[in-house]
UniProtKB/Swiss-Prot annotation:
NCBIfam families: miaB-methiolase, MiaB/RimO family radical SAM methylthiotransferase. It comes from the Bacteria. This is tRNA-2-methylthio-N(6)-dimethylallyladenosine synthase. PANTHER family: CDK5 REGULATORY SUBUNIT-ASSOCIATED PROTEIN 1, MITOCHONDRIAL TRNA METHYLTHIOTRANSFERASE CDK5RAP1. Its EC number is 2.8.4.3. The gene is miaB. Belongs to the methylthiotransferase family. MiaB subfamily. Residues 145-377 form the Radical SAM core domain. It comes from Photorhabdus laumondii subsp. laumondii (strain DSM 15139 / CIP 105565 / TT01). Its cofactor is [4Fe-4S] cluster. It is found in: Cytoplasm. Residues 380-443 form the TRAM domain. One of its GO terms (molecular function) is 4 iron, 4 sulfur cluster binding. Keywords: 4Fe-4S, Cytoplasm, Iron, Iron-sulfur, Metal-binding, S-adenosyl-L-methionine, Transferase, tRNA processing. Residues 5-122 form the MTTase N-terminal domain.
Length: 476
């Protein structure tokens, strides 16, 4: 009797990495029959999907590999692979420091994992592939599998902006968009499996320019409308965006596409024009605020979250106060803030890191305190309002209750029926807590007027097909 082969994946970093890890698991199950396990000690393959955004990312990788080396010492047949952005950045240097590693692959070569594994098994020699083969990886991945009512779908890879603090262009390459029909096909497959909410992923999604079947180009604004037209997809999110490409055509989608949530994450990083110039962000604080004004005109109830880097080289107290003023002017909702630390290989790493750690921590505390106050104010303002939530499952705190999320990402716990899971309900917010809300159901999905346009099956049927020699046909 054959034993089940097991795969363990440890993932650090962004939602793109989470998406990539899920695709690795699906791919290796389809090609080799590997089943995911949560226990590293029982796995036949260990994969580490790394992130290079945080401080000391490389050292974190080697500490983890040191722990895994002990497992390989007791099981020489164990295969260890390192992927993600640190792998892309460091390449064979990882092997030099951690000879227990068999496979090193980048974000753009994860689709080649089956061949890499076969090569290691056959020759026991290590494999390194951190190339950037355009968008090839999406052509080689298995069909998507829904895991709950929400799903992430990658629409593009890479970034061309080259902000001075960021490693993404060097680790994930420049911007490459997936063909429009491929994206719609994947989302239609997910919708047919019961997915109700999709989060469109990319390092800079508003730069999306996807080829269509007839040789035209689909913009990001057009893509959102096409996704919204797929029956069952009644909530659309996207992340992440860059202000300089948040164009008026994207803002216009907020006027006519109710499936697009009234919540936007739009990183600004600093409120000081001088620091924004040093960061090579290519916009001013005033230009950022102009985008927000247009958005609020198109969608008055929209909430905005952002990213902030504290203590960038050369940041003075005046620069920081300008950031705090921007936070007050925009009145941001929940946001992410980080103390600056240099990323090797980035232009900012050559700048003198002249803000003391003590000063960075003090500024971070003040900023987070302000953001938390504003976010709590938004939560309190929701008391007594009616919110549409997507029911994700049972509540973490009480299995006799259900839990879901509002458009602005608040967790709402409420009493409901099990058949509500995976559907939308309207609830009245009756209590507000620090990390969640409490609601009372006032309307179920069958009482809603959700738009119906095109069935997932129809989208799947009209997707471009290729014959044995690669000639494409399209069925309108």
């Amino acid at each position: 009797m054959s034993t089940i082969k097991k795969l363990y994946i440890k993932t650090w970093g962004c939602q793109m990495n989470e998406y990539d890890s899920s695709k690795m698991a699906d791919l290796l199950e389809s090609t080799h029959g590997y089943q995911l396990t949560d226990v590293a000690e029982e796995a036949d393959i260990l994969l580490l999907n790394t992130c290079s955004i945080r401080e000391k990312a490389q050292e974190k990788v080697f500490h983890q590999l040191g722990r895994w080396k002990n497992l390989k010492d007791t099981n020489p047949d164990l295969i260890i692979g390192v992927g993600g952005c640190v792998a892309s950045q460091e390449g064979d240097f990882i092997r030099q420091r951690a000879q227990c590693v068999d496979i090193i692959f980048g974000p753009q070569t994860l689709h080649r994992l089956p061949e890499m594994i076969n090569q290691v098994k056959g020759t026991r020699s290590p494999v390194v592939d951190i190339s950037f083969p355009e968008i090839e990886k999406f052509d080689r991945l298995p069909e998507p599998r829904a895991e709950g009512p929400s799903a992430f779908v990658s629409i593009m890879e890479g970034c061309n902006k080259y902000c001075t603090f960021c490693v993404v262009p060097y680790t994930r390459g420049e911007e490459v968009s997936r063909p429009c029909d491929d994206v719609l096909f994947e989302i239609a497959q997910l919708a047919a499996q019961g997915v109700r909410e999709v989060n469109l992923l990319g390092q800079n999604v508003n730069a999306y320019r996807g080829a269509t079947y007839d040789g035209d180009i689909c913009s990001f604004a057009e893509l959102i409308r096409l996704v919204a037209a797929i029956d069952g997809i009644d909530r659309i999110r996207f992340t992440t965006s860059h202000p300089i490409e948040f164009t008026d055509d994207i803002i216009a989608v907020y006027e006519d596409t109710p499936e697009l949530v009234s919540f936007l994450h739009l990183p600004v990083q600093s409120g000081s024009d001088r620091i924004l110039t040093l960061m090579k962000r290519a916009h001013t604080a005033l230009e950022y605020k102009s985008i927000i004004r247009k958005l609020r005109k198109a969608r008055p109830d929209i909430l905005i979250s952002s990213d902030f880097i504290i203590g960038f080289p050369g940041e003075t107290q005046d620069d920081f106060e300008k950031t705090m003023k921007l936070i007050a002017d925009v009145n941001f909702d929940m946001s992410y803030s980080f103390i600056y630390s240099a990323r090797p290989g980035t232009p900012a790493a050559d700048l003198p890191d002249d803000v003391s750690e003590e000063e960075k921590k003090q500024r971070l505390y003040l900023l987070q305190q302000r953001i938390n106050q504003q976010a709590m104010s938004y939560s309190r303002a929701m008391l007594g309002s009616v919110q549409r939530i997507l029911v994700e499952g049972t509540s973490r705190k009480n299995v006799m209750e259900l839990s879901g999320r509002t458009e602005n990402n608040r967790v709402v716990n409420f009493e409901g029926q099990p058949d509500m899971i995976g559907k939308f309900v309207d609830v009245e917010i009756v209590d507000v807590y620090a990390n969640s809300l409490r609601g009372k159901v006032i309307r179920t999905e069958d009482q809603m007027d959700l738009r119906i346009h095109e069935s997932p099956e129809s989208v799947i049927a009209r997707t471009r097909k290729e014959d044995e020699i690669g000639v494409g046909t399209y069925q309108p």
